[in-house]
Structure formats: structure tokens, C-alpha cells
Design a protein with these regions (language model features):
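Non-catalytic pre-domain segments flanking phosphatase-related domains
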Residues: 1-7, 26-29, 33, 206
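Mg2+-dependent phosphoryl-transfer enzymes with acidic/Ser/Thr/Gly-rich catalytic loops
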Residues: 1-4, 21, 185-268
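Active-site phosphate-binding/coordination module
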Residues: 22-122
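Hydrophobic packing residues within well-ordered alpha-helices of enzyme cores
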Residues: 24, 49-53, 162, 166, ...
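Short active-site oxyanion
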Residues: 35-39, 63, 149, 209-210, ...
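Short, structured coil segments at secondary-structure junctions
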Residues: 61, 69, 170-172, 226-227, ...
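Conserved acidic, metal-coordinating active-site core of Asp-based
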Residues: 98, 102-214, 218, 223, ...
Length: 268
């Protein structure tokens, strides 16, 4: 029995205008009112997606969000951390060494803000990520704290060849995923959205047999594979669609709502 619906945002729940459609909003609100837990799963911090949380009414004491691609499970009302997994500064040193050798712009994030390393300008992350503090500093001044991830954010034309040339030993040091055409993320090795969802399911006394997930990209792969119902958008990547329980319509054609309307017909 499905008790939780977990949703990626970009190119999944959100349309190309970065909006939740009226149809998707209506269906998810109805499920939430019927006691189904609706959980947004994102690589972003909670402040950056707060308008979507409010739009869906996910502000009850038992509402949670999976942020930082599973690195932080946070209560929407109290902001208490149910689960977190990060990296030390020393874990980032291999990546620092590589971007220095190639002069690639890099951002690193803790669980509250973005550190924009200004050694090599050109990052477009400020235009992509809203409602979060940015602090510019040189790589030499990076503080000794816990980090959620590192991000290369440059135009797809520049990023694509960089990804193709990433050394295997560097990728092996992290859970490296391309979350959007202009974003490459470097996460803790064992981190993914499925890990965050497992912590949340455990909290409620449930398991993956009670989970439905929606996604489209590489950073959704593990949660699509783990869930009893792993649903991928028609616009999703071929390798992600290959492990899906089912394929639904595109993000611009209310794919989330269309699938839920069929699956939860007796509730809606």
C-alpha cells in the first residue's frame, strides 16, 4: 500500500516555466488531505523551494522534505534535521585540485549557504539557485565545516565536455551526478535521494513497499529503483526510464497528476 509519494522537482513536478501546474497542485493536495505523505525531493536547500512547499500546503508537523539530494531530511514546520550526511573539507581536496588544474568554476554548499569560490569566475549558480545566501571567497579560505555538496554550474555547452573528461578516479571519490544540463554535482559517496527517503520511511515505520517516486534524471535513479512504484517522466533520461515501474506523460503535460489520478482513483 502506497503511503508516501516522493517527487523530484525540475523536469518532473515542475513544468518548463518552473511552475507547479494547477492540475498537479490539485491532485497532490487531495492526496495530502487523504493522509498520503507528499515529499519533495531536491538537490536544493529548503529555503530555495519554500514557495512550492507553501503552494502544496506541506506545512503540517509531520511534513518533511528531502534536500541536498538526500543529504538532509528536514521537517518543514520545525526545520529540525531528521537525517544528514555531508563531507569534510578534506573530502573536497581531490576536486579542488582538479578544478584548479582546469580552471573550472566551483561552488560548495553547507546546509545553509553557498560558498562561491572566486578563484575561477564563470559560475552561473546564482542565476539557478534562489532564496539562499551566497558568500564569495577564495579556495584558500574555505572553512573547516561540514559540506553537503560541490557544484559545477556553467552553460551546457561548456559543461558537457568537462563531464566527458572527468577522470574515473575523481568520479569514484564522490557520488557524481548531472542533475540539470548546466549542473554537475559532487555528493558524498554513499548519498542519494533513496537514502534520505529510507531515513524518512524508517521514521514513520514504513518501507520502500509503501513508496511511490517520480523523477527524470540520474540523481533520481536510486529512488526510482527502490520504490514499489518508481515512475519516470516521458521526458526522462533513457537509463532512468529503463528501471521504471511505469512511464508517465511529460512534465509539461501534467505527468505526475495523470499517473496519480489513475493509481489513486478511489481516493481522488
Amino acid at each position: 500500500m502506497i503511503k508516501m509519494v516522493a517527487l523530484d522537482l525540475d523536469n518532473t513536478l515542475l513544468n518548463s516555466n518552473k511552475e507547479i501546474s494547477q492540475r498537479n497542485e490539485r491532485v497532490l493536495k487531495q492526496l495530502h488531505q487523504q493522509g498520503i505523505k507528499v515529499v519533495l525531493c531536491t538537490g536544493r536547500p529548503i529555503n530555495a523551494i519554500w514557495p512550492y512547499i507553501e503552494q502544496l500546503g506541506l506545512t503540517d508537523p509531520e511534513d518533511y522534505t528531502i534536500t541536498f539530494n538526500g543529504g538532509l531530511v528536514i521537517n518543514n514546520e520545525s526545520r529540525e534535521h531528521l537525517f544528514e550526511l555531508g563531507m569534510k573539507k578534506s573530502d573536497l581536496l581531490p576536486l579542488f585540485s582538479y578544478v584548479k588544474s582546469k580552471k573550472i568554476p566551483l561552488n560548495i554548499l553547507d546546509f545553509e549557504r553557498v560558498y562561491e569560490l572566486n578563484d575561477y569566475p564563470g559560475s552561473i549558480y546564482r542565476t539557478v539557485l534562489k532564496n539562499i545566501e551566497f558568500q564569495a571567497l577564495p579556495m584558500s579560505d574555505v572553512p573547516e565545516i561540514t559540506y553537503s555538496k560541490a557544484v559545477m554550474a556553467i552553460t551546457p555547452e561548456k559543461l558537457s565536455p568537462i563531464i566527458k573528461e572527468l577522470p574515473a578516479e575523481l568520479k569514484a571519490h564522490y557520488h557524481a551526478v548531472q542533475s540539470q544540463p548546466m549542473i554537475m554535482e559532487f555528493l558524498p559517496k554513499k548519498l542519494n535521494k533513496a537514502g534520505g527517503l529510507k531515513a524518512l520511511l524508517d521514521h514513520f515505520g514504513d518501507d520502500f513497499s509503501n513508496l511511490m517516486t517520480f523523477g527524470d534524471a540520474d540523481n533520481d535513479l536510486e529512488m526510482i529503483k527502490a520504490a514499489a512504484q518508481g515512475i519516470v517522466m516521458e521526458n526522462g533520461l533513457p537509463n532512468v526510464k529503463a528501471v521504471a515501474t511505469a512511464i508517465t506523460d511529460t512534465n509539461d503535460n501534467d505527468g505526475v497528476a495523470r499517473y496519480c489520478e489513475r493509481y489513486f482513483a478511489t481516493l481522488l
